[in-house]
Amino acid sequence: TDRNFLRL
């Protein structure tokens, strides 16, 4: 998932 990306 792009959860890490959404963290930005």
Swiss-Prot record:
Q: GO terms for biological process?
A: neuropeptide signaling pathway
Residues modified as Leucine amide are 8
Q: Look up the record and report any one GO term of the cellular component aspect.
A: extracellular region
Q: Where in the cell is it found?
A: Secreted
Keywords, ordered alphabetically: Amidation, Neuropeptide, Secreted
What residues form the membrane-spanning segments?
A: none
- Please give the family membership noted in the entry: Belongs to the FARP (FMRF amide related peptide) family.
The function of this protein is:
FMRFamides and FMRFamide-like peptides are neuropeptides.
Q: What is this protein called?
A: Extended FMRFamide-5
Question: What is the native source organism of this protein?
Answer: Namaquaphasma ookiepense (Gladiator bug)
Q: What is the lineage of its organism?
A: Eukaryota, Metazoa, Ecdysozoa, Arthropoda, Hexapoda
